[in-house]
Design a protein with these regions (language model features):
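N-lobe entry segment of adenylate-forming
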Residues: 1-47, 51-66, 70, 139-147, ...
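Conserved pre-ATP/AMP-binding loop-to-beta segment of ANL
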Residues: 33-36, 155-158, 165-189, 196, ...
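Structural core segment of the AMP-binding/adenylate-forming
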Residues: 93-163, 483
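AMP-binding/adenylate-forming catalytic core of the ANL superfamily
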Residues: 105-115, 122-126, 276, 388, ...
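Gly/Ser/Thr-rich phosphate-binding loop
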Residues: 250, 270-278, 287-351, 364
């Protein structure tokens, strides 16, 4: 195909890794046994690669003792902690599938994920912020029937490890010997435009190789110490974070159970971190904190900004004020393990700031006309498609949803509007789908709309994203009350509280008697966004 077309592939002299996550981790342990593997500052936890792997083995044996078989789904519902990381590698070791559960989920969302994935074992924190996980698990039991055992981060965790002591090394070796690199290893639930979250199913091959090439692009080695304040339940934390470290022998440094700019900066200073991750809002908070207090960030070199569109002005400040001269921007999605393109160290400054980089090794991308599906020319805007080793296996137990995004040629249709320039750099300009991205969180309008319908006075509800300087987008709900019914913003907010995750509760509300409609009777969300932006004094979307 002519280079005039918006198509490119990541030709590479570096071969893909044809091994499981555990096989790869063993190599790192053998090479760097005394190198620090994991530091969890908020738990006063430290482990070298030798110590870390010994604990992974303990957890793996505990899972076998619980009766976890190859292919069984094991849930983890917790903020960042060392136990989460041990489970990530232990489930991979024995061929189980780790199911990441968003710590902000409430009972109804938890029930859906348990039933949809068929979880057999759940690991969970007891409580975090306003979430009482133990109570929600108790409330969920009558609506689920697949979970055999729930283990919390308390004495039951200690007992779980103790039970694993009766499993022999030989039993463990037999189990790990059956694991194949194309086996599913992880299910991550991500919101789309069609309602309930979908279970993105990823293999060892998917995420191990993506982590490998992310690290190569950032020049990672065993001397790097990577500060990971982003959540593990996202690919950002567990793949770009944890896996990219272990595949290159670097150190995972976890500053806190959730993001805190002060603790993050203090941890970088104390642990001499060389790399820092975050969504744009995290970097904005860190820059604001640095105006109040001086931190020694001289050890920083690189990092990743991703999760939502990265404002060029913020990128400039991070490079200049945080000493992150080699920071990279990543673009991707959970369905692609997650990174498809990434800026390169040493690329022209403008390309590092105003694009999302170039294609990763061994992957392909193209820009197509959303209607005709024809490949467009460079410089033209259309839908971005990705193909290659990184594309997910499927949406768990959702063949129809899978076929909607994965075509016969295995192209992943992202729903994102993008443009490829003459040099092959990718520029993201928006989305075809109505998906809202608030501070890096994917939020389905339909999921919130369906929930709002359950409120007694609501006749109709429509949810849109409106521009936000801080989060990229905020949620706005337009409510059409039933005839003769008056609904206040306060009462419907109270209804949402503790029933859906806090980040899904709309910030803006508008009560209407009608919605803007097309002649054929379809609701015009484009016009709704224009009206909202005008009334709220916000910039309308392009």
């Amino acid at each position: 195909m002519s280079t005039n077309y918006a198509y490119t592939h990541g030709a590479s002299s570096i071969p893909l890794l044809g091994e499981t996550i555990d096989e790869n981790l063993k190599k790192t342990v053998e090479k760097y046994p005394d190198q620090e593997a994991l530091i969890c500052a908020h738990q006063n936890y430290r482990a070298t690669y030798r110590e870390f792997y010994e604990q992974v083995i303990q957890v793996a044996k505990g899972l076998i003792a619980l009766g976890v078989k190859r292919g069984d789904r094991v849930g983890v519902w917790s903020p960042n902690c060392y136990q989460w990381t041990l489970l990530q590698y232990a489930t991979a070791k024995i061929g189980a599938i780790l199911v990441n559960i968003n710590p902000a989920y409430r009972t109804s969302e938890l029930i859906y994920v348990i039933n949809q994935s068929g979880l057999s074992v759940m690991f969970s924190a007891l409580q975090f912020k306003s979430s009482n996980y133990k109570k929600m698990m108790d409330d969920a039991r009558e609506f689920t029937d697949t979970i055999r055992k729930t283990i919390f981060w308390d004495k039951s965790w200690d007992h779980f490890l103790k039970e694993g002591e009766r499993i022999s090394d030989e039993t463990l070796r037999k189990r790990e010997g059956k694991v194949q690199f194309d086996d599913p290893v992880n299910i991550q639930y991500t919101s789309g435009t069609t309602g309930n979250p979908k279970g993105v199913t990823l293999s060892h091959h998917n995420i191990l190789n993506n982590a490998y090439f992310i690290g190569i692009r950032m020049n990672y080695s065993h001397v790097d110490r990577v500060c990971i304040p982003v959540p593990f339940y996202h690919c950002f934390g567990m793949v770009i974070g944890n896996l990219a470290c272990t595949v290159h022998g670097a150190t995972m440094v976890i500053p806190n159970d959730s993001f805190d700019p002060v603790k993050t900066l203090e941890t970088i200073e104390r642990e001499r971190c060389t790399s820092l991750y975050g969504v744009p809002t995290m970097f904005i908070a860190e820059l604001q904190e640095m105006e109040q207090k001086t931190y020694d960030l001289s050890s920083l070199r690189t990092g990743v900004m991703a999760g939502s569109l990265c404002p060029p002005e913020i990128m400039k400040k991070v490079k200049e004020q945080m000493n992150m001269h080699e920071i990279t921007i990543c673009y991707g999605m959970t369905e692609t393990s997650p990174v498809s393109t990434q800026t390169k160290i040493g690329a022209p400054f403008e390309k590092q700031i105003y694009s999302v980089g170039t294609i990763h090794d061994h992957l392909e991308i193209k820009i197509i006309d959303p209607e005709t599906k024809a490949t467009l020319k460079r410089g033209e805007s259309g839908e971005l498609c990705t193909r290659g080793y990184s594309v997910m296996l499927k949406y768990w137990n959702s063949p129809d949803a899978t076929h909607q995004v994965l075509d016969e040629q295995r192209w992943m249709h992202t729903g994102d509007l993008a443009m490829m320039d003459e040099e092959g750099y990718l520029h993201i300009s928006g989305r075809i789908k109505d998906l809202i991205i608030r501070g890096g969180e994917n939020i389905s309008p339909k999921e919130i709309e369906d929930f709002l319908y359950t409120y007694k006075g609501v006749m109709d509800a429509q949810v849109i994203g409106v521009p936000s300087e801080k989060y990229g987008e905020e949620i706005m709900a337009w409510i059409k009350p039933k005839e003769g019914v008056t609904i206040t913003e306060e009462e419907i907010r109270d209804f949402c509280k503790d029933r859906i995750a806090h980040y899904k509760i709309p910030k803006y509300w508008k009560f209407v008697s009608e919605f803007p409609m097309t002649i054929s009777g379809k609701i015009r969300k484009v016009e709704m966004r224009e009206i909202a932006a005008r009334e709220l004094g916000l910039e309308p979307e392009d």
